[in-house]
Amino acid sequence: SSDLVCEKMNQAVCRYGTEHHIWSMGSTMAMLLFTPESMFACNLGDSRIYFMDGGKLQQISTDHVFGGTAVGKAPLTQYLGLPEELQRLEPSVTEIEHKEGYRYLLCSDGVTDMLSDSEIEAILSQDMEIPEIVNDLLKNALQKGGRDNVTIVLCEVQKLDTVRRMKEWMKNLKDKK
């Protein structure tokens, strides 16, 4: 389950911090989980997951931030590296529809702090290949200031036959081990 995946990632980050004497270490996270029947969006922190449907951008992740602050950015309420003894990790998980041609954007706040949703939507709506769109998002985020790291993953659901081929590929990888 996504909760278990997040728990294991969190433990790994906490363990690394402890082993290397880093007491303030963390990361946001956004991921898509695929099963043969469905797809799930999961996030911690303020990294976002968007969905493009008919040219309209929709945020499907939840920002885990403390209420608005007068100055600067709101602190995160959930993130990888959050010690279990301080607070329980509660990732946001949403089951989402997947159809051929649907596009999903996973990105860090290095994108969303620099570009508005309407700017992101305009870039994603362009009739270009995925690598070109990613480069355009990156270029625009950096031109607007790029004060934080800029992480972008853009994926498009292909024909369901691709899912079958991917399963075979994964099975072959396991068989080789």
Language-model segments: residues:
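PP2C/PPM-type serine/threonine phosphatase catalytic domain
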Residues: 2-177
